[in-house]
Amino acid sequence: MEPTMNRQEIAFLNSLYLWHTERITKQECLISLKEILEKTVPLEKIRQAKEEYLSDGELIYFYNIADKAEGEEKADLMESAHAICKRLVSENGIGTDISIYELMMDSVASYYGNAGKYDRSDEISDKIIKEDLVLRRMTMLHESIYNKLWNHSERIKESGGEEDKKFLYEELEKCIRLAELCKEIFSEEFYTKKQKEVSKK
């Protein structure tokens, strides 16, 4: 690893640490992450899809920037993230970059769901689930199942319909078991809490 990349990675981890420990704001973290990424590649070049090769580190930095951005900037960056993942798959096949694909596309799916684009969100989550099953990976299965469940619930709310408690409970049970197998304690606790809320309805 080159010295520049070493410094870049250390600065990246430090920025996330400062944000997680509430020593800097999300906006300050975002500014720092942009500066870190631009030590090796301009953010604008990525947004305009003019940078053909990005290292795994640069993709992770970009993902974190997109994830922490807000408003129109977030929308623009998420579209760029979607385009990058499509290009990775077309050039290398999904198996080569599956970890990066899962991470970025799960965030894109969540963004589309929050923006009310439920079908687009579901389509991405379905692809993640399918590819994870083919490649025998469990890492993102619970998140993709929960994303689809969240979209389903939002559709029901918007239509004024009544949710199927049994269906919600069973889907959350899947999420709990998968999170447990992956030793994702925080996610397991989150799904368990949601399941208890369903039981009280």
Task: Show the residue positions of the predicted features.
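Amphipathic alpha-helical repeat scaffolds of TPR domains
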Residues: 4-21, 50-72, 98-110, 142-156
